[in-house]
UniProtKB/Swiss-Prot annotation:
Compositionally biased tracts (Acidic residues): 188-206
Pfam families: GATA (PF00320)
Transmembrane spans: none
Protein name, UniProt field: GATA zinc finger domain-containing protein 9
Biased composition (Basic residues): 237-247
Biased composition, class Polar residues, residue ranges: 1-20, 36-55, 273-283
Organism: Dictyostelium discoideum
Keyword Cell division attached: no
Start and end residues, zinc fingers (GATA-type): 479-504
Disulfide bonds: none
Length: 536
């Protein structure tokens, strides 16, 4: 900010820029040409009056150049030093996981030890809501059937999973769809189409009941299969309704007019009859020209000929007419799965833009001691509502408590966007992540898996009280002679196998050998004595 002082011999004129100061006191002491340099402070940092005793003027025109030093309102109000500011690139913080189905996503969560899963979902108005849950609350069944978050059933899209490298804890950001709202709308349409009317040979109305789709059929590729099934279901339903409508029109108009046409009356919004058509080809040509019956006028019920439609037939005809425009618009917009994929890409792009807009791009450095003296009521930089749920009509106290436990920063949701410093020293996520931690999060440094913790017994018993280890061949045996139950080997005794211990068995075997050796000698001598001395 500079001010120009113009001096003429006859008069003194002062020209200032719009943001110049109100008072300038200039003292003329000598006639030398001196360029003075003074330091000023803005109204935020200093006073408005400026005293420059060294400023001099001359009879000729001189220019006084001033250098101003401004104080940043951010550092003046919050005490944050601007020299220690780290700028985080949001594009580098969101790294795509490359998951294609729920199975790969749950394997990634388990193998990489992901701690938090941040779920985002849009509402009917296009507003995005976010909530953070623990990874142990997510399972393969939840990914297939839906995760219950804040009273809503959310279907996660594994193809949109991204690593959030801006947070200290390992976090995955996933986009989801609220299937409670979509299932309710689909169920209302299914109620209309579940019971379709068919004329039997006898002329009576029949009902066709279709079984609901199994929940576990979406296991292979949930996101892609859900989009394709939804688009195919809408197109097949509209085609089926159109065929049924043409069939009922032709059958009801068979006795009333021409055999190949149908009488259709057209009315405007006030109920005045405009014109009528008596040809099926006219209806078909308008259908191909406008992408369906696109004239915008409500149709009257078909004229009753030789046979009426019946109560259920009239209800089905009215339901098909009510949903005709919606189905035709669906057929025009969704020419296969490409239209749905395009809308999904637009949804993904808007989701990423919402995340980038709600993230903090300027993070203060905690090494500055000025952050420790910040007051709770002092203004702070605005941060996005990436933590906590701002869903309307829901109690967010439990979610905010969980989020405050997960990360040291509590950020209010909705339009608040303020930094809540509750207790102690707290920092935004990603403020203390150094290069080593970033390398670990990005996968450049691989750490060994955690070792299993040692198992400690509740109470240790002495060796005397510990039970003795049983041998593999231990049985309930005891020695028949000494009564012992512990022996290195069991031996044969008079009562059979394994009836004596090792010591008693050896002693018994020696006795048996001695007896066997003594018996033949006695018998031999006895026989010789009998031979030599035969008895009478």
């Amino acid at each position: 900010m500079t001010s120009f002082l113009l001096f003429n011999p006859g008069s003194l004129q002062q020209q200032q820029q719009p943001h110049s100061f109100s008072k300038d006191f200039i003292n003329n002491n000598n006639n030398n040409n001196n360029n003075c340099q003074s330091s000023f402070s803005t109204p935020l940092g200093g006073s408005n009056g400026i005293n420059n005793p060294n400023a001099t003027t001359n009879n000729t025109t001189t220019t006084t150049t001033t250098t101003t030093t401004t104080t940043n309102p951010l550092s003046g109000s919050t005490g944050i030093n601007n020299s220690n500011i780290e700028v985080i690139d949001i594009d580098q913080c969101l790294k795509h996981c490359g998951c294609r189905n729920p199975k790969e996503l749950i394997q990634l969560i388990r193998s990489d030890a992901i701690e938090n899963v941040e779920i985002s979902w849009p509402d009917d108005m296009g507003l995005w809501y976010m909530n953070t849950i623990k990874s142990h609350e997510v399972s393969l069944q939840n990914l297939v059937e839906g995760v219950r978050v804040a009273g809503q059933l959310l279907l996660l899209d594994p193809t949109s999973a991204r690593f959030d490298l801006s947070k200290k804890q390992k976090t995955i950001v996933v986009r989801s769809v609220n299937i409670d709202r979509s299932s309710s709308s689909l169920s209302s349409e299914d109620d209309d189409c579940c019971y379709e009317t068919e004329e039997d040979d006898n002329g009576e109305d029949g009902e066709v009941v279709r079984s609901p789709q199994s929940k576990f059929s979406l296991l292979l590729d949930e996101s892609e299969k859900f989009r394709k099934s939804f688009s195919l279901k809408k197109s097949s339903r509209s085609a089926f309704k159109k065929n049924k409508k043409d069939y009922h029109h032709g059958s009801s108009a068979g006795g009333g007019g021409s055999s190949g046409g149908v009488v259709v009356l057209h009315y405007d919004n006030n109920g005045n009859q405009l014109h009528y058509s008596n040809s099926m080809t006219d209806n078909n040509s308008r259908h191909h020209q406008h992408g369906g019956v696109g004239d915008g006028y409500p149709h009257s019920p078909p004229a009753a000929g030789g046979k009426s439609l019946g109560k259920r037939g009239y209800q089905q005809w009215s339901n098909s007419n009510n949903n005709n425009n919606n189905n035709n618009n669906n057929n025009n917009n969704n020419n296969g799965a490409s239209g749905f994929v395009q809308s999904d890409e637009d949804l993904d792009a808007s989701w990423l833009e919402e995340i980038k807009r709600n993230r903090a791009e300027v993070v203060p450095d905690l090494s500055s001691p000025a952050l420790f003296s910040m007051d709770k009521r002092s203004p702070s930089p605005t941060l996005g509502s990436s933590c906590g749920s701002s869903s309307p009509g829901l109690n967010n106290s439990g979610n905010e408590m969980n989020n405050s436990q997960d990360s040291p920063l509590g950020v209010s949701g909705g339009n608040g966007n303020s930094l809540n410093i509750s207790s102690g020293i707290q920092c935004p996520p990603g403020a203390n992540i150094d290069s080593a931690e970033k390398a670990i999060l990005e996968g450049q440094i691989h750490l060994p898996p955690l070792l299993r913790p040692r198992q400690y017994h509740a109470c240790k018993t002495s060796k005397e009280n510990r039970p003795t280890k049983r041998r593999k061949n231990h049985t309930s045996l005891f020695c028949r002679h000494c009564g012992t139950t512990d022996t290195p080997e069991w031996r044969r005794g008079p009562d059979g196998r394994k009836s004596l211990c090792n010591a008693c068995g050896l002693h018994y075997s020696k006795l048996v050998k001695r007896e066997n050796m003594a018996v033949p000698e006695l018998s031999r001598t006895f026989e010789l004595s009998e031979i030599l001395n035969p008895s009478d």
